[in-house]
Structure formats: structure tokens, C-alpha cells
């Protein structure tokens, strides 16, 4: 059991944002496995306030790409998960935003578990969330864009070349103990 614990901790710590992809398909079963993990995210009162669009269609990817500085990432990814908060399922905004964050983290971890795939959570597109809703003909009264996760086969040459270790704040910088 102890070794599983350490493996899980190491697994979480080795997840990285991947912004460079090579051309390659992702099977429907793999996509469904990732979505299955996502749906197990915790949510207050188990309201599961998420709605997700799986975008592989080139025209839709291009329309999304036009709305963000991250256009090359959206276009080069095999698929983009476009995640919305379902406002009709919402009961407490803060708790629902936390649930969406957990949902999106589960996607990132599930993609990381495949080892050959990578993903990045894109938030800059939120500046154009109404236009994203228009692409999908979704009411802004019912759905609010929370983010896009681009997923594809990692371009190992770029990932290894960049190889930088991202700095993380030390625990002392943000942890206070009350004992």
C-alpha cells in the first residue's frame, strides 16, 4: 500500500501542461475513459454542474482558435474539451466553480495516465466566452464557459527539449500551522 501511495504522489507531481502535439488520433475508448474519470469529480450535493463538448471537427476547432491567443494549441490538438458550468444545475456558485476545477483536474490527470498523451488547460479564451457559446448555439443564461482543455499526442522532441522544471512555491510560503 505504501508504494501505491508514493506512486500516486509522484504521478500527481509529474503532470505537466503540454502545448505541443504531433498528429495522431485518440481512440473513442480513450476519450470515454478520460470522461469517465472526470465525472467522478466531487461536487456539492452531488449536483455535477458540468457540461462538456468534445471537439475534433476542424471547422469548429478553427472557430474556437479565432477567439484566443492560444490558437495554434487548439488547432494542433487532436481534440479540445470545452467545459461549461450548467447554470440550471448550479446551487452555489463558489462550490460549483470548485467542482468544475476538480472535474478539469481529473481530465488532466486521466490524460497524464495514458503517458503518450498530453493536455493543457486554456483559460485565456474565457475573455470571449459569449462567442464560444454562440459557436455551440448555447444560451449564456444556461451555460457559462469555464475553460478549454486541449489534448493530443505529445511532441516528445519539444517536451524533452524544453525540459524545464517549473518552480513551485515552497510549502513555507503558503502553509500556516495551528497546533
What do these predicted ranges mean?
Residues 1-179:
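Acidic, surface-exposed loops and disordered segments
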